[in-house]
Regions:
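Conserved phosphate-binding/catalytic loops in two-lobed NTP-binding clefts
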Residues: 105-106, 266-289
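A contiguous, well-structured pocket-lining segment that forms one wall/lid of small-molecule binding clefts
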Residues: 66, 179-249, 258-272, 296-302, ...
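Conserved phosphate-binding catalytic cores of ATP/NTP-utilizing and phosphoryl-transfer enzymes
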Residues: 1, 101, 105-126
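A short helix-loop
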Residues: 8-9, 26, 122-123, 128-131, ...
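Glycine-rich phosphate-binding/hydrolytic loop that grips phosphoryl groups
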Residues: 279-318, 322
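Low-acidity, Ser/Thr- and Arg-rich intrinsically disordered low-complexity segments
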Residues: 330-353, 364-365, 376-388
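Glycine-rich beta-strand-to-loop/alpha-helix junction loops that act as flexible
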Residues: 75-78, 95, 131, 249-258
Length: 388
């Protein structure tokens, strides 16, 4: 059984193809980069409409399959930007109707959880979901993925992008912050807004811009922003783990690619006697493979959708989805996509003061590609029939 997934919640149009065992045969994407300013939903949607057919073709070519080999198609139903979601949904509907195959709309946030579980071998984690539009701490409880904490204003990724524009870094500023922070030498106190398991970031933008106007180097601002924001995320994640009794923590979302965030969460997990998991970078960011995998899980657990059921939902919370597949499928843990993170670089934020040395950030190289026989896996996937 081969499933194609189409991701289109925000700036990325991604298409992935997976089989019933979460072997990823292709994971292609094209990212919209605004010429200036921030992300405009309609401009991003126009970009997605222009590249969708090409990305779908590229994904099938890389997987070595054609349209007739796809048994199921899934797409990101939400949450996300309405115009972008509609492009992905339209492409999926057209493919499903043309090929007369089933279609499944999935929750984008849950897709991050499930691809992480499948590829790292963790079984029942608390998820720190740190992305552009969302920042949440999520865990499975009573048949659904419950949100135990979240941002009260903007997502961590949006905060970094907005601050990056204000500081002249351009759009998609997260990687720039990570690079600059490694060169920083002083930590400056910024608003630390944590209430229970919720966080807020907007005050940090105002304070960081004020530091910039005072002549504080960008490197020190980046260091201070990362340390403060990531300490907040680590604190609420630890509080949620204690509250719900989880011994595993999974990172997901685009900001989970940041080496310093990984280091801080890993250090916290070790201190609690827990374990941290994180998939390869390509599965942290928005991607089609995670959409395909969740669609396959849902279909194999009995979920069915008509075309009339595939209306997109800009606001679509994880706890609105009944997670039937966790009752119907046992997981066979695969090797983690990343090595364990060393905690020797970690340092408690509370011990830092202006003028102290910064903690070191960690840059992770991508793992070596899998060595499984590609053709054999494709043949096996093709031989697996759809569930009735």
């Amino acid at each position: 059984m081969l499933t194609m997934g189409i991701e289109g919640t925000a700036h990325t149009l991604g298409v992935g193809i997976v089989d019933q065992d979460c072997n990823v045969f292709s994971n292609e994407l094209d990212m919209f980069r605004p010429p200036q300013g921030g992300l405009h939903p309609r401009e991003a949607a126009n970009h997605h409409a222009e590249v969708a057919a090409d990305i779908m073709t590229r994904a099938m070519d890389k997987a070595g399959v054609g349209p007739k080999d796809i048994d199921l198609i899934s797409f990101s139903m939400g949450p996300g930007l309405g115009p972008c979601l509609r492009v992905a949904a339209t492409a999926a509907r057209a493919f499903a109707c043309t090929r007369n195959i089933p279609i499944i709309g999935v929750n984008h946030c849950i897709a991050h959880i499930e691809i992480g579980r499948a590829l790292t071998g963790c079984r029942d984690p608390a998820l720190l979901y740190a992305s552009g539009g969302n920042t949440q701490v999520i865990a499975f409880a009573e048949g659904r993925y419950r949100i135990f904490g979240e941002t009260q204003d903007i997502g961590i990724g949006n905060m970094l992008d907005k601050l990056g524009r204000d500081l002249g870094m351009g759009f998609y500023a997260g990687p720039v912050f990570e690079k600059l922070a490694k060169e920083g030498s002083k930590y400056y106190e910024l608003p630390y807004s944590v209430k229970g398991m919720d966080v807020a970031f907007s005050g940090m933008i105002t304070a960081a811009v004020a530091l910039h106007k005072k002549g504080v180097p960008l490197e020190d601002i980046a260091l201070s922003v990362q340390e403060t924001a990531f300490a907040m995320l680590t604190e609420v994640t630890e509080r949620a783990m204690a509250h719900i009794g989880k011994k595993e923590v999974l990172l997901g979302g685009g900001v989970a690619q940041n080496g310093r965030l990984r280091d801080m969460v890993e250090d916290m997990a070790h201190a609690r006697g827990a374990e941290m998991f994180v998939p390869d970078r390509q599965y942290c960011r928005d991607n089609g493979a995670m959409i395909a995998w969740l669609g396959a899980e849902m279909y194999n657990s009995g979920v069915r959708m008509d075309i009339s059921d595939t209306v997109v939902r800009q606001r679509f919370r994880t706890d609105e989805v009944e997670v039937g597949w966790r009752r119907s499928r046992s997981y066979l843990p695969s090797a983690s996509c990343l090595p364990r993170i060393s905690s020797r670089f970690s340092r408690n934020l509370s011990t830092m003061s202006e003028g102290t040395d910064p903690p070191a950030a960690i840059l992770w190289p991508p793992p070596a590609p899998p060595t499984d026989a590609h053709a054999s896996r494709i043949a096996t996937a093709r031989s697996m029939p759809l569930s009735s």
